Amino acid sequence: MNRNPDQNTFPNITLKIIETYLGRVPSVNEYHMLKLQARNIQKITVFNKDIFVSLVKKNKKRFFSDVDTSASEIKDRILSYFSKQTQTYNIGKLFTIIELQSVLVTTYTDILGVLTIKAPNVISSKISYNVTSMEELARDMLNSMNVAIIDKAKVMGRHNVSSLVKNVNKLMEEYLRRHNKSCICYGSYSLYLINPNIRYGDIDILQTNSRTFLIDLAFLIKFITGNNIILSKIPYLRNYMVIKDENDNHIIDSFNIRQDTMNVVPKIFIDNIYIVDPTFQLLNMIKMFSQIDRLEDLSKDPEKFNARMATMLEYVRYTHGIVFDGKRNNMPMKCIIDENNRIVTVTTKDYFSFKKCLVYLDENVLSSDILDLNADTSCDFESVTNSVYLIHDNIMYTYFSNTILLSDKGKVHEISARGLCAHILLYQMLTSGEYKQCLSDLLNSMMNRDKIPIYSHTERDKKPGRHGFINIEKDIIVF
């Protein structure tokens, strides 16, 4: 029986809050389910919608001026969403509406609304780099790694890009300046800030409040365009979310990291924006070349990779005084693979205090072995390295999420050997350890190399889990 609650049965204040919000007297079930949400509901009810409408209009004028929509349409969409609960009777949908409205009323002003007020002066901090001098070296390095054979029968997943990306990029440039303690960028846009000749698509970001930011941005886009916006979570990418429109076109994505991880990520300051240190990005690029898919990307567009690598090589030459003379010493470090147990042993004693590194290709196996070691000093850098690291009894234990390329049966390809070395160097940088000699040898080991065909490769670790999503239009949250 779905009776209305007796006014004398429930506390009048809570009942009144829920009644005002729903625009009707709640049923007994609605009251009991929603009473613990009374505080959030009250915040939503007293929220000044007129000020919010004004902020969205200002965001539209500044970042989405080319989108054909009127001020009255924006206002109608906002007021319609904030009254949606009055026509909703499903408890699950009501909870979703309350949660998303709560995010808007408590965070939008500080996260996106602030972008409409006068910005602090930009501190010009660019250094002139002679990238041209590194282009030939980068091309030589990449040419020796351009060994993937493209299977023309292989069906490649299409990455459709929304026309709104350019608007969101404009917003993100300002967002990165205003929120540079909680959000940093990497990838092509960050390198563009060093070398304006770099081409970039969307802006790659790491931040500490990814979910909240993406929800606020999704609503901004919805209110301006009227389109249904969906946020998706991918299980095999740690703390990753992406915004897509109703036609599955990519708008922006983001990785979320803890503040303590953000604090140790090496970064540099350019024009009021923090970017991941290009040295760190170069190591990540070398690491990623162990992934067969990335080598296929290199084969399709070598010049794109060349521009990026030349920029990063010039940065490390200028910043660290790296001399490119071909002296490689013990790089890449010796790597022996146990294909049955899916563990690669890297001999590290020539460079580091730990004598070897056991690189696991299955994360669950590593987690189990760490438990058996009864060690509690492991470091988890989340999506920054996509791995945990532990040093115990002079042995490093870590996980490698990419494929391992083989140049012959049981023999690790030098591309993967360098990738494993780069993975270890990422740890050294994150923990303020010694890395510069090793970095110099690693980069020099990439010079004057012949192409070595790929014999085979290991499979990537299979990640369990299901896709999650937030569908604003349908009032569904699945995580």
Swiss-Prot record:
Keyword presence, Protein biosynthesis: no
Entry's Gene Ontology molecular function annotations: ATP binding; metal ion binding; poly(A) RNA polymerase activity
Function: Polymerase that creates the 3'-poly(A) tail of mRNA's.
Catalysed reactions, as listed in the record: RNA(n) + ATP = RNA(n)-3'-adenine ribonucleotide + diphosphate
Keyword annotations of the record: ATP-binding, Calcium, Early protein, Metal-binding, mRNA processing, Nucleotide-binding, Transcription, Transferase
Active-site residues, record numbering mapped to chain: D202, D204
Induction line: Expressed in the early phase of the viral replicative cycle.
The keyword Metal-binding belongs to this UniProt entry's keyword annotation: yes
Protein name listed in UniProt: Poly(A) polymerase catalytic subunit
